[in-house]
């Protein structure tokens, strides 16, 4: 919950399960409540068609297996041309651009990162549906360490620790 003067202006609660076989996604399920609105995704890999079958709150249909789940902690999102929304199942084309190398300081430790910009390929999408994220990736640990974006305020996600 995000509260402003005692009033909830944003809330999100969700749960998701991803299953991989031989490093390939075969199943994804999520249920999310965002601002009291239920969102969901049920994705399964169909062996016959070799495609993902998606039943989501904003999209139902097929998607190619070159899509990745739009999860900020999956570095494969930086190599993909399409992502599946982990909240609603919508499929969006994306463009990932390298910005520059940067050092990040997280919890007193310095990390070398590659800074990327991830944007929607389709500029005609409404602003609230567009992808527009800054992502910092650490090659040494093969991890996304930070993601930031501006939508209903400025948001920043940082990885606190890892094993």
Q: Which ranges hold each PLM region?
A:
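Hydrophobic, well-structured mid-protein blocks that either form specific transmembrane helices
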Residues: 30-72
